[in-house]
């Protein structure tokens, strides 16, 4: 195989149990987001926009929709050997050594595929999660990794100390070399010179290739290990004196974007997913999809334009402060502060507000829907209300989150 300078490996096998029922039939990275994308698209665009084109995507849990999405819509062609995005399912590649086991953790997923790293002989390996919403110039992080002569560089997100108890926290010296890793500490240690802020690990790493091999081979031999980068590999690297540095995500430059890079969301719960979706519909969104210098590619399904019809009395087709994909028809209804995916139809006299409707949802006449996530292929009968009586919603079998968001599962029949 052809040699590459930087090899990307994306961890996309997560079950995403806290996103159920959205993950009932799909992996977390395959969950739709932002009217036309899937969550995996954002990290893939980060690699491609950063000029890193040799990418493996490691899959495991309910990967069919994710597999189809990448195979159909993320193709470079067959003429450049160092340009590829290839899927790597869990396949017991080390069966003779490990026995009949799938990926046992984030580190083990890479360990079971070290032969792929060996084949390309990269200078550095970028190991990123496939389930976050963010923009990142990964090439800038790689250059920082080279400049510091690091064995490992960890992307870090500054958070208020009061919020840092939810994260793995990195303690650094004045050079931003990591001296300690705290897993969800009760008393997080602040950044030097910034007593109100702590450094949270984003779970994205750049490894010197030789260090990656050494650490993963040692971890695989450790029978007490959970084979996780944050819990096992990074603490081992610190104990054994590896050069481990933090990279300040806020200083990551995005072409076409002014100011610091502030937006990173782990949409690992239904409420977090909903909040990130609502971020998109603000007049000045926290996460801007409209940056021609940082294009966000995804499936091109050749949908027709969105359409708004009727303008008589209360029967007015309109959408306010919303994102609508191709093929949406708002026929005499009102959509407000919502995200509508492909081929959604909102019929006359209905109101949809602060909601997310996946592909092929149809809202009948005189419906009222608020604070809801409705998965694909749901036909809502006329005069139905969702999000107004939470006990009724629970009785229907819908999920109601701690923040009161109602989630209707894929293909639900009223």
Swiss-Prot record:
One of its GO terms (molecular function) is glucose-1-phosphate adenylyltransferase activity. SUPFAM superfamilies: Nucleotide-diphospho-sugar transferases, Trimeric LpxA-like enzymes. The keyword Nucleotidyltransferase applies. Its EC number is 2.7.7.27. Alpha-D-glucose 1-phosphate binds at residues 103, 168, 183-184, 201. It catalyses: alpha-D-glucose 1-phosphate + ATP + H(+) = ADP-alpha-D-glucose + diphosphate. One of its GO terms (biological process) is glycogen biosynthetic process. Keywords: ATP-binding, Carbohydrate metabolism, Glycogen biosynthesis, Glycogen metabolism, Nucleotide-binding, Nucleotidyltransferase, Transferase. Transmembrane segments: none annotated. PROSITE patterns: ADP_GLC_PYROPHOSPH_1, ADP_GLC_PYROPHOSPH_2, ADP_GLC_PYROPHOSPH_3. It is an enzyme of class 2 (transferase). Pathway: Glycan biosynthesis; glycogen biosynthesis. NCBIfam families: glgC (TIGR02091), PRK00725.1 (NF001947), PRK00844.1 (NF002023). HAMAP family: GlgC (MF_00624). Belongs to the bacterial/plant glucose-1-phosphate adenylyltransferase family. Involved in the biosynthesis of ADP-glucose, a building block required for the elongation reactions to produce glycogen. Catalyzes the reaction between ATP and alpha-D-glucose 1-phosphate (G1P) to produce pyrophosphate and ADP-Glc. Homotetramer. This is Glucose-1-phosphate adenylyltransferase. It comes from Thermus thermophilus (strain ATCC 27634 / DSM 579 / HB8). The gene is glgC.
